[in-house]
Amino acid sequence: MKFLPIIIFYLFLFLYSVEFLSFSFVEIDSINHFPFLKNILHLSSDLFGKNDYALRFPSLFTGFLSVVIFYNIAKLKLKTKREIIYTTYIFMLIPGMIISSVIVNKSVYLIFLSLLFIYSYEKFRNFSYILLILYVFVDKSLISLYLALIFYSIYKRDTKLLIFSLILLAFNANYFEYKIHGRPKGYFLDLFGTYFLIFSPFIFVYFLYALYKNIFYKKDLIYFISATAFFVSLILSFRQKIKIDDYAPYTLGFVVNMVNVFLKSYKVRLPRFRTFYKILFVVLFTSLIMLDISLFFNKYTPAKKLSYSFYFPKNLAEILKKEKIYSMSCNNEKLSEILEFYGIKKGDKYKLIYSKNKNSVSIFHKNKIILKINVSKLNTI
């Protein structure tokens, strides 16, 4: 029964994503740049057919497994059952965790892999080394994990782990031809804005505070993984625009350390001096819930620059089918792939012109426009 609320929450996310979200441009990019994800989706399509259920299930199931593993990590780090349960719920409700679970992207898989390694390292040390070897071939972003292990092994004075991590880092960097590129240009504020969205503003501020405060406590593997990923992304942002899904997934596990920092400050004080921390918890948790709610109602907001493509393609396909248009050519390859997913095949009889700047779609037949649709209005159907 302890996992029942988690099951209910992820069932809600599954039904929500199938009902309201469309296969999007962002997800097309994610699939094309992460072969591992493409293979998973092919397997899901073979099992469930080519539909939204098959599209959303793998990410959401992986998200659910990540929460379960996090719960087991929390059991190793916290003392009471109440602390463990609340910490797990906080992790589950982090906006970045929700977003990565409902959207087809690599983030949720990286969260799962990092948490699986952390738990394995604590409980099944030899198995964790096997995981590290396998991770070399998964994605280039795992270089952050290997770099964190180098720092951790130096801190623990573990020569064998240091050499092992250096070798795996070299293999990973070589296999994916890891490069630092781009002209020097500051994306520092953009990065911070993204982290604000991932954690929620107040939680992210506390994340920074906990990173600092954890320096004075005994540092564990979670601290090194989260701190390394965060500071590497920070340093690189001064030079180039980074892909946040290469770094942010490794920071979410730090939630358990954030709670530990909070509890240590709370418990050392007498009951009459704990009022500030009770208020702080209410403020942090309320801000988290409010941002979560805004995510689900995002479809109905006037400006959707970040998320507009998650809503209109499915509705567009339905409109085309009502107009008895089942095949067409399209000036946008990504939109063409999405429409094909929803049953609109490629053909020459009709032509679709998509204008991102004007938020419009125009349908032509024999060089004559027969239908024009405002994409922004499709978002609120």
Regions picked out by a protein language model, each given a short descriptive name:
Residues 109-127:
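Specific aromatic-rich, kink-prone transmembrane helix
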Residues 57-77:
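Transmembrane-helix motifs of polytopic, lipid-linked glycan transferases
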Residues 126-143, 148-152, 233-234:
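Membrane-interface alpha helices of multi-pass inner-membrane proteins
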Residues 87-92:
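Short helix- or helix-capping micro-motifs
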Residues 296-369:
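Short periplasmic/luminal acceptor-recognition loop of GT-C membrane glycosyltransferases, typified by
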Residues 241-270, 274:
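Hydrophobic/aromatic-rich transmembrane helices and adjacent perimembrane loops
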Residues 99-107:
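Short acidic/glycine- and proline-prone juxtamembrane loop motifs at membrane-interface regions
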Residues 266-295:
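Signature aromatic-anchored transmembrane alpha helix within multi-pass, membrane-resident enzymes
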